[in-house]
Swiss-Prot record:
Known catalytic reactions: a (3R)-hydroxyacyl-[ACP] + UDP-N-acetyl-alpha-D-glucosamine = a UDP-3-O-[(3R)-3-hydroxyacyl]-N-acetyl-alpha-D-glucosamine + holo-[ACP]
Pathway(s) annotated for this protein in UniProt: Glycolipid biosynthesis; lipid IV(A) biosynthesis; lipid IV(A) from (3R)-3-hydroxytetradecanoyl-[acyl-carrier-protein] and UDP-N-acetyl-alpha-D-glucosamine: step 1/6
Organism phylogeny: Bacteria, Pseudomonadati, Pseudomonadota, Betaproteobacteria, Burkholderiales
Entry function: Involved in the biosynthesis of lipid A, a phosphorylated glycolipid that anchors the lipopolysaccharide to the outer membrane of the cell.
Gene name per UniProt: lpxA
First and last residue of the signal peptide: none
Record localization: Cytoplasm
Organism: Paraburkholderia phytofirmans (strain DSM 17436 / LMG 22146 / PsJN)
Name under which the protein is recorded: Acyl-[acyl-carrier-protein]--UDP-N-acetylglucosamine O-acyltransferase
Molecular functions per Gene Ontology: acyl-[acyl-carrier-protein]-UDP-N-acetylglucosamine O-acyltransferase activity
Length: 262
């Protein structure tokens, strides 16, 4: 049987695995599904059409699955889907999607979401992401796997943050950060390749060297973006461990709608 504090409210229709723990004064809505071994802290609210996987930890006073902060929202049954083993700390807010997008906000697995983070409607957060305290994601933001967003940072709507990238604290990000790149500032500017993060994740020296060369092409050689793309295509087929990550970088740049930080 689920371990639910007597002061918690679990609305009829909610589906909780028998191993779920719900703390004092928490509220679980009627359309919520919570997987095994997940814990919900005191005074937290999980509402809307929200699904949580297994082994998640929801901190005190978190608000998960709330209505989108979008004036076009008309009570459609949009969703929030959260994977497994995520930590979502105190006072975090995560909203469901809107019909103007795909109707769903998603978080992957093994994410570390610190206190007072906001994840807006229609955001898509990958896996193994760190969002530091007070980081604020506007609607429709996409964050790749293993990315880090520093505390007190603001991210504009529709911005993409590439895998393995890092945004420094107190930054304002209005354009896309390519994968593997460090950015910081108001407004955020590029500051090199996330070498230490790549080493920790097992990238080979050859792969890191190739990404450093790609960074020079993109940011240091005085090339236009179109000229840089031509040279990146050559680097991406040079042979060796560097091909795959450079191809990932190039594909991200080519797909950018808002433009990349420059």
């Amino acid at each position: 049987m689920s371990r639910i504090h007597p002061t918690a409210i679990v609305e009829p229709g909610a589906q909780l695995d028998e191993s779920v723990e719900v703390g004092p004064y928490a509220v679980i809505g009627a359309h919520v599904t919570i997987g095994a071994r997940t814990t919900v802290g005191s005074h937290s609210v999980i509402e809307g059409h929200t699904t949580l996987g297994e082994d998640n930890r929801i901190g005190h006073y978190a608000s998960v699955g709330g209505r989108p902060q979008d004036m076009k929202y008309k009570d459609e049954p949009t969703r929030l889907v959260i994977g497994n083993r995520n930590t979502i700390r105190e006072f975090t807010t995560i909203h469901t999607g809107t019909m103007q997008d795909a109707g769903v906000t998603t978080l992957g697995d093994d994410n570390w979401i610190m206190a007072y983070v906001h994840i807006g409607h229609d955001c898509h957060v990958g896996s193994n992401v760190i969002l530091s305290s007070n980081a604020q994601m506007a609607g429709h933001v996409t964050i790749g796997d293993h990315a880090i967003v520093g505390g007190m940072s603001g991210v504009h709507q529709f911005v993409r943050i590439g895998a393995h990238s890092m945004l420094g604290g107190a930054s304002a990000l209005v354009q896309d950060i390519p994968p593997f790149v460090i950015a910081a500032g108001n407004k955020a500017e590029p500051h090199g390749i996330n070498v230490e993060g790549l080493r920790r994740r097992g990238f080979s020296p050859d792969a890191i060297s190739a990404l450093r060369a790609a960074y020079r092409v993109l940011y240091k050689n005085g090339l236009s973006l179109e000229e840089a793309k031509v040279q990146l295509r050559e680097l991406a087929t040079a042979g060796g461990d560097g091909d795959a990550p450079v191809q990932t970088l190039l594909a991200f740049v080519e797909a950018s709608q808002r433009g990349i930080i420059r």
